[in-house]
Amino acid sequence: YLPNGDLAGGSVILGLRSGLDLYANVRPVKLFDGVMHKVHGKFRQIWEPEMVDMTILRENTEGLYHSLLKRASNRAQGLPEYTIPEVEFPDLHGEVVYDPRPISSHGTERLVKMGFEISKTRNGAPLDGVSRVSCIDKSNVTRGCQLFRRTFDSVASNYPDVATDYGYIDAFTQWLTRTPEHYDVVVTSNMFGDIATDLASVLQGGMGMAGSGNIGDDHAFFEPVHGSAPKYAGMNKVNPIASVNSIQMMMDWLGRKDGNAEILEIAKAIEQSVSCLLYTSPS
């Protein structure tokens, strides 16, 4: 860790997210045929492939991680250290440490809009084929989430052909595992999305299967959801699928951004290759 408590090396990825304004962390959750789920130490089929196919969008620059992202961005650019404003907390004693959780209408609006646009490119929820965008928050408690939901409703009014629904993050975590087939596109705030998407990776076989994209209006970069997996160091074990899936996402983004049909075909070919490999290989 750095002297200020931030994770060493975080300036690279975190700095890019904030510095390039990559406001949407897009994480597809798709279960391929042939992939088992490790539960109680054993591999078995828990969820059915045709019932797990959603995309979760996590706000990527605001919320509980805003201060960390801003510090990382400033450090990467050689700018002065960002410090959060001083705040008094009545009735708290001893050492008090806090991380603000700012949520803006602007940041929420562009995230939600991307979610609705992505829904137009998909086949709807596995359960019923309905194009649906789900707003996941904690608006019964926090004011930031109340703004998030109000902004969601405002954006949703521009997409009358796309269904909407809502959930509180605590309830969503159980629905995610009990009825994943209900979900098509999900939008949520930064920390909620960070936690929920790691949980959702279990549906697709684990973190080693999960790719992601950090996407803004003009720039993007793509990475596996997982970290460096030091527990496997020296064991000659590797699962490249999350990296390959991230490359597939990159090609799809480039193809759509540039209107390049050839690149889009490459993206489809990568997805088909992964699907074929997993179907014909032992889990």
Name the predicted role of every residue range.
Residues 15-32, 161-167, 209-223:
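Short, acidic/small-residue loops that bind anionic groups at enzyme active sites
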Residues 167-174:
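Short acidic loop-to-helix transition motifs that present clustered carboxylates
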Residues 92-167:
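Glycine-rich phosphate/diphosphate-binding loop of Rossmann-like nucleotide-binding domains
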Residues 279-283:
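Conserved small/polar residues in nucleotide/adenosyl-binding loops
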Residues 1-85, 97-98, 191:
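N-terminal glycine-rich phosphate/adenylate-binding segment common to multiple enzyme folds
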Residues 175-269, 273-277:
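Glycine-rich phosphate/nucleotide-binding loop
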